[in-house]
UniProtKB/Swiss-Prot annotation:
The lineage of its organism: Bacteria, Pseudomonadati, Pseudomonadota, Gammaproteobacteria, Alteromonadales. It is found in: Cell inner membrane. Signal peptide: none annotated. Coiled coil: none annotated. The gene is nhaB. It comes from Shewanella sediminis (strain HAW-EB3). It is a multi-pass membrane protein. Its main location: membrane. This is Na(+)/H(+) antiporter NhaB. The keyword Ion transport applies. Belongs to the NhaB Na(+)/H(+) (TC 2.A.34) antiporter family. GO terms for cellular component: plasma membrane. It comes from the Bacteria. GO terms for molecular function: sodium:proton antiporter activity. It catalyses: 2 Na(+)(in) + 3 H(+)(out) = 2 Na(+)(out) + 3 H(+)(in).
Length: 527
């Protein structure tokens, strides 16, 4: 039967997405202008719900296309203006530069990071110790790098391990070509392969949680941290200090959770590395060490020095985060002899789709600002006083971040609280405390689902997920103990007064200085 033009259109529209999803998006595009004509406020909220729906369906279709179409239509029918969208992009240029340059910069440091993580797995035999090392190492790296970058590195490590084992177990040598996605090789022991997959799933989930534990601590750990820091006019060290009353107890709670789930082998954890696999990986590491040339050793040394520059540059805020990332690209490529344009271009492939998606987020944020969608919610939350207000903001951010991307949630809330500050509804000191509640609320409970954390979504949609049988449901189940512990410890740190008391102590000892409203007004604003 010949294909009609309408069938061809539906087939082409959003590619391989399910038909019901395509119809849903087309329905949204038809309904939205009608609702906007009848009631702009309801239409605005409908757009936000639709956009969250596209994020939740990220595995069916990358959210850039359906979310982007909704955003374009919103601008076209007057829900916001192109100038307001551009203003949002302008206000968040540093975040865009972080994603473009920092993620690409770390691409050129992968050799060093692969070397370090390989040593961890081959030298340490205790699964509990390896799990803790992966979790802590990911947390440390995420405090200085974007969590997406860290997960990208650890995925590369896991794919490397998997392909090495698969190749040797299929009867080939390290140097042979091999398709590690095919399990049709009769030499493969399925029990061994299944156990190894479980082991890699465990390590990737511990590393993913580690990125959340470290990412919440500093202004560069997650994109929304940078947005919050810009609105509050905080620098690197001040941001880390203000977060510490919540982030330090949460970090230790996370590490204890890592130990307990491995010790008692619950929620899918506790999978051991089979002895045969360990032997293969150790032999590979020895093979690499034996064949490492002076050129290779110099490259590792250069990457270590660049890593040191990265930490120092960020800690002392020697330049904006994106520019430090650009300097990493230039130095890592110049001193390691990477001068081919195509080789450099590969570094940008991982982050640019997400950067484009972030630009669409800001278009939706522009609609929220112009239609004043969050004003009733914010006014309700602000009607409470002191500590209760902080707890409500933490919970409100946390619940929304579980189903929607935390960059989106954090951006919306900090913009609204900033507006309340500039209109005189709250004091500057209360604004600073609310900024901490918003940052921790968006970062910690969002580990619940891949929708909330960009790094988790990146892991779920990566090449490694199908190889190690890591599905959406399995990720949610494995993240559950962490979700419960991190969320509860975070809310208790605020509810029991640790945040207010420690912040006051920092003021009293002059480790922190009070900011004025003028500081915030002078900071980059989304209004």
């Amino acid at each position: 039967m010949p294909v009609t033009m309408s069938q061809a259109f539906i087939d082409n529209f959003l590619g391989n997405s399910p038909k019901w999803f395509k119809i849903a998006i087309l329905s949204f595009l038809i309904i939205n202008p009608i609702i906007f004509y009848l009631n702009p406020f309801i239409a605005g909220w409908l757009l936000v719900v639709e956009f969250i729906f596209t994020l939740a369906m990220a595995l069916k279709c990358y959210p850039l296309q359906p979310g982007g179409l909704l955003a374009i239509e919103a601008v076209a029918i007057g829900m916001t203006s192109p100038s307001q969208v551009f203003h949002e992009l302008e206000a968040n240029l540093e975040v865009l530069l972080l994603l473009i340059f920092m993620v690409a910069g770390i691409y050129f440091m992968k050799q060093l990071l692969l070397f370090v993580f390989t040593k961890m797995i081959t030298k340490v035999r205790s699964k509990i110790v390896v799990s803790l090392m992966f979790c802590v190492a990911s947390a440390f790296l995420s405090a200085f790098l974007d969590a997406l970058t860290v997960i990208a590195v650890i995925i590369a490590v896991a794919v490397g391990f998997y392909s090495i084992y698969h190749k040797v177990a299929s009867g080939k040598s390290f140097a042979d070509d091999h398709d590690h996605t095919s399990d049709g090789h009769h030499q493969l022991c399925q029990d061994e392969l299944s156990a190894f997959r479980g082991f890699l799933r465990n390590l990737l989930m511990h590393a993913g949680i580690g990125t959340a534990l470290g990412g919440v601590c500093t202004m560069v750990g997650e994109p929304q941290n940078l947005i919050i820091a810009a609105q509050a006019n905080w620098q690197f060290v001040e941001f880390a200090m203000r977060m510490s009353p919540v982030t330090v107890p949460v970090f230790f709670a996370g590490i204890i959770t890592c130990f307990l789930v491995e010790k008692f082998k619950v929620f899918g954890y506790g999978q051991q590395l089979p002895e045969a696999v360990h032997t293969i990986l150790s032999e590979f590491a020895a093979h690499e060490d034996a064949h490492r040339t002076k050129h290779d050793k110099v490259k590792l040394g250069i990457q270590a020095l660049i890593g040191l520059w990265l930490v120092v540059g960020l800690a002392f805020h020697l330049a904006s985060v994106g520019l430090i990332g650009l300097s990493v690209i230039i130095m890592a490529t110049a001193f390691n002899g990477i001068t081919n344009e195509h080789a450099i271009g590969k570094a940008f492939e991982e982050a640019l789709p997400f950067t484009a998606l972030l630009a669409v987020f800001f278009a939706i944020v522009a609609v929220i600002i112009d239609q004043q969608l969050f004003a009733p919610v914010i006014q309700w939350a602000l009607s409470y006083e002191g500590n209760t207000q902080l707890v409500i903001f933490y919970i409100a951010n946390g619940l929304l971040s579980m189903v929607s991307d935390n960059v989106f949630v954090g951006t919306v809330y900090i913009n609204e609280v900033k507006a309340a500050l500039l209109s005189g509804q709250i004091t500057r000191d209360q604004f600073d405390l609310l900024a901490v509640a918003i940052n921790t609320g968006t970062n910690l409970p969002s580990v619940a689902t891949p929708n909330g954390q960009a790094a988790f979504l990146f892991l779920l949609t990566s090449a490694i997920a199908p190889l190690i049988r890591l599905s959406y449901g399995r990720m949610v189940w494995m993240a559950l103990p962490y979700t419960i512990v991190l969320s509860i410890v975070g809310v208790l740190a605020i509810h029991l007064g640790a945040l207010e008391q420690m912040t006051q102590y920092f003021y009293d000892t002059q480790m922190l200085l009070h900011h004025s409203v003028k500081d915030a007004a002078g900071a980059v604003s989304g209004h």
